[in-house]
A protein has these predicted regions:
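C-terminal, non-catalytic tails of nucleotide-sugar-dependent glycosyltransferases
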Residues: 123-144
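Donor-binding/catalytic cores of nucleotide-activated saccharide
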Residues: 1-93, 100-116
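A short glycine-/small-residue-rich loop at the edge of a beta-strand within enzyme catalytic domains
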Residues: 112-119, 140, 144
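A short alpha/beta connector and helix-capping loop motif
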Residues: 89-98, 121, 145-146
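Membrane-interface aromatic/basic loop that binds lipid-linked glycans or pyrophosphate carriers
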Residues: 10-16, 130, 157-180
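Alpha-helical elements of Rossmann-like donor-binding domains used by nucleotide-donor carbohydrate transfer enzymes
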Residues: 84, 123, 127, 170-173
């Protein structure tokens, strides 16, 4: 896909899929790449989780009552959707051509400072951890989930530093949190 910044500049987003068709246990590996990256990988996640770049089977959505949650309920609702949907998908096909323009929105909930972001990140972490525990042993998903969570914690700290006059106190509290 193409990534369009707030100033209008366009760049091809780096996407690196191992293959164009995933089936069976390969779908689990694709999902784990959305959850987080392996320790040696340079980024926090290996595969973008955004649902806007996918097409989904309406019969699967209806048969399993899969719904897309609001970002106001959980952060990164895209991953929660994929956790549910990919458990029922028989195959995932990747189209290599960039067919979508994603326009960055600085006013979206993802980019705006929220005083409760860290609390919501922890709630999201616990929800994803509980969902993954139903499908995988902890040693399979925990390193990936923890690495991605720490990346999200870094974003919380950066937002505190940039937008909150009490940032040192809040950052210290984040760093002392047992989950971190």
């Amino acid at each position: 896909y193409y990534d369009v910044s707030a100033d209008g500049s366009v760049r091809l987003a780096p996407e690196d899929y191992a293959r164009s068709l995933y089936t069976g246990a390969e779908i689990d590996q694709l999902l784990l790449g959305m959850v987080g990256s392996r320790p040696h990988h340079p980024h926090d996640v290996e595969i973008g989780m955004s649902v806007w770049k996918g097409l989904y089977s309406l019969p699967i959505l209806r048969a399993h009552h899969i719904r897309f949650l609001s970002e106001r309920e959980y952060l990164s609702e895209d991953l929660l959707f994929h956790l549910d949907y990919l458990a029922h998908a028989g195959a995932v096909a990747i189209v290599p051509e960039p067919l979508y323009y994603y326009c960055q929105n600085p006013a979206s909930l993802t980019g705006v400072y929220r005083a409760d972001r860290f609390v919501r990140e922890k709630r999201f972490y616990e929800k994803v951890s509980a969902e993954l525990a139903l499908r995988f042993p902890p040693e399979v998903y925990r390193p990936r989930l923890d690495k991605a969570f720490l990346g999200r914690v870094r974003r919380c700290i950066a937002q505190e530093a940039a937008h909150n006059k009490n940032s040192l106190r809040n950052i210290a509290a984040i760093c002392r949190d047992p989950l971190v």
